[in-house]
Amino acid sequence: MGKRSKTSRKGKKAWRANISSEDIEDFFEKTTRDALSGGNLSAAPSEDLFHVDKSHDLPVKRKIEKHRERVLRVDSILKKNPFVQLVPSSKPKLKKSKKTIVIEDKAPKQVQKSVGDDSVMADLWGDDSKGEHESNPRKIFKNPSIISAVEIEHPGCSYNPTTESHQDMLAEAVAQEMQKVYKTELGPAPVPLTIEGDTLSEDERYFLDVDNFSEGEDNENVENEVSEAGIKLKENPFVQLKPSSNTNLKKIEDKTPRQAQKSVGDDSVMVDLLGDDIKEDLKYFLEVGNVGEGEDNKDVKIEVSEAGNNVSRKTKRVTRVELNKRCRQKALRKKETKEKAKEKILNEIDSLPNILEEIAKEDEDKQNKHLRRVIAKQEVLKIRPPRLGKYKFEAPPVQVLLTEEMTGSLRKLKACCTLARDRFKSLEKRGILVPSKQIRRF
């Protein structure tokens, strides 16, 4: 370092200005370093500087003890291995159906025992029934059917019923049969294979052929006249046409008379006629479409002059007064539509209470309709099951005896009902079996 410059030391002010502050700065640095390092070591007590370990020494294991703690190979094989998956059960899984609810056990799964745990040996021939139902935690519950398994028949179906109950059951059986008859009669009629009709005689056929032939000739005559007029105009050497009108003549031949006239007027075909025959043909060609048209072509006027025979169209010019009148009418219509829309909105605001009443009434009707549907569905379930397959359940006919079949004794009873068929229909009605189509054997 360079040599410090000398300063004046006269007076107290000069002495104070040149006093060195290095000692103070060193002290502050030391105190800061001690605070960060945990305190001054020279002032710390001995207990904080040293630690006396008073714990006992662990005994040294001998070689024999270590050898005894080893697990043999045969023992390790018998213990459970957490990395090996369990053998799956051979029981098939139950298929879930619409009417089957599967409830799984919500108990927490037990953690698999570690390798060090001892395996528990169970007696295979013991009578311990503990945990017999705990092996399968899954339980199956089915919705109970509203229809009972064994239904009690009406008293009129008995082998010896009273007169009133027997008549009631006969009326019900007749109603079921008549319902089937009405269903077939009111259904759509089948498509008939043959249609009945009167044969035509030879004279009637002849008159029909003549009418068809005359209608065809009328159409052909009109088309021939139009085409001949166009061919004459095209083949005449004295006719001068514009270059763009050659294609128009081809189009005229394929069009109807009225369309041909319009096409000639639109394209402004310029024709110079030097002969009377050509002039007459042109007039006839232009007047073919005007038959029966009185006031349709008032705005469009066709003039054929003798000098040039030019075909022109005159249109009416729209004046400023007419345009101003149309603008005023348009603005008036627009204003009327706005006023009508405004009046409609005001009427809707005034009728707001009525609208709220209608909405409340509609909600009430919807709720009542939903309630009726639920009740009707429950009533239907009491009679027949829900549809499970392709075919609907068909209730068997009422097993009621006729008057001549009633004997009043079980010994003389006619064997008409079978228990197997009754049980089969009961299973279908309760929704246990899917209804199938009845196969008739001939």
Swiss-Prot record:
GO biological processes: ribosomal large subunit assembly
Listed Pfam families: Nop53 (PF07767)
Main location: nucleus
Function: May play a role in ribosome biogenesis.
Entry-linked InterPro entries: Nop53/GLTSCR2
Similarity remark: Belongs to the NOP53 family.
Lineage: superkingdom: Eukaryota
Subcellular location: Nucleus, Nucleolus; Nucleus, Nucleoplasm
Source organism of the structure: Arabidopsis thaliana (Mouse-ear cress)
Residue span of region Disordered: 242-264
Keyword Nucleus assigned: yes
Cellular component GO terms, alphabetical: nucleolus; nucleoplasm
Protein name: Ribosome biogenesis protein NOP53
Sorted UniProt keywords: Nucleus, Ribosome biogenesis
